[in-house]
Amino acid sequence: MKKMAILVITLLGACYHSLVMASFTQYSSDEVNFMHRAYLKHKPEITINEVKARLYENQFLLQQAALKTPAIIKRQSAVGFSTQYHVERYLKNLFDSQLAIKAQSSLVKLDTYDSQWLKRTLGPYPKNGQYVQSLIKKMQQIDLTPILYNSINLYEFIDALSMQVRFKLHRGDSELFKSELIKKRQFNIAFSKAKPILAKQGIDIEHLYEIAKGDILRPSIQSWLGINTMMHMQSPVLEKLEKQVNKSEIKAFYQANKSQFKFLSQVKAHGAQFASRANAVDFHTLADNKSLEQALVISGKQDIYAQYNSELNRKNKSSWVVQLAFTTKENTISAVIRTPSGEWVVVHSYEHQFDYFSPEDETVRYQATKAIAKQKAAQQYENNWLKWQNKTGVIL
């Protein structure tokens, strides 16, 4: 078992180093085929060529990140797990599905790491989420290598975990701690077993590390570059491009996409308001059988749009009932609708008239600026991707 630990330490050290390297990697046909089999389980229609293109595009993305936003390579979010943690989960699943490796090993005693040990060792969770040097040094002195089969101390182990998990560990969740230890241990064992099997298949384990990292970081890097949208992630590339959009570009975009700036400018409407839902339902039935205007006369109800002479425009839209008329389908009687004040209304909206925002309107400027910046970001991305292919000699 000691020999296995030394082997894993050596191999993982090489792969950890590969996480920060930005040199070009040529994937073998065996490696592409291996990943094709893996992707097929989630996307049955994917082709070999599509897999090859994805793997190289991911490699291109990693190099873009290394140049422009290197922090994302280590961790996508300050509160999330490290990239290394995600890579290990990705590879463990890959080994399980493609190699059928059983990572069982001799039982390891974890009784030492109980709730009291965690609380005593870690202390209270820091309010700002950042560890002070004294605690870091203390954790660095606790060696987990005998348990995990790779050279790692407690700080390195905990630093890879998410903020939520770390918080629970500081509160003494020993079962969670042991669970994470076992995950790490099982990965390292599976890793040591996978390497010779993969080597016989013509697959470099370091290449799989890069492939895993590329797949994991792909959405975040593309979002950073402005060609993909990811929640809670801003794109400095888009922000810069948006500032460069000028009036002539906005005008040209407006002329080419005028139809998307069409809006409902005016409607005609009649309606009645009731304190009781039952009365509103009765009125709705009457309006269905006659017409809403006739129902107003028969019931003696005042038209809630009388103050506007039943002709409504966007200037009146601050009123809730006016907004309702604009959102009601043309030539239809609405359902019985509860108002914010707790009353009930029934409305009829008709003769909808449309107009176009002017090129100078704030809505046009905002939407056009966003769209133009995205177009430019996509073009930049495509140009850089093609340059990278030409530079590396990749043929897709």
Say what each PLM segment does.
Residues M1-A5:
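Positively charged n-region of N-terminal signal peptides that target proteins for export
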Residues I6-L12:
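Sec-dependent N-terminal signal peptides
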Residues Q302-A306:
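Compact soluble domain cores
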Residues V20-A22:
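Boundary at the C-terminal end of the N-terminal hydrophobic targeting segment
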Residues F24-Y27, R37-K52, Y56, Q63-V297, ...:
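PPIase-associated folding chaperone regions across multiple families
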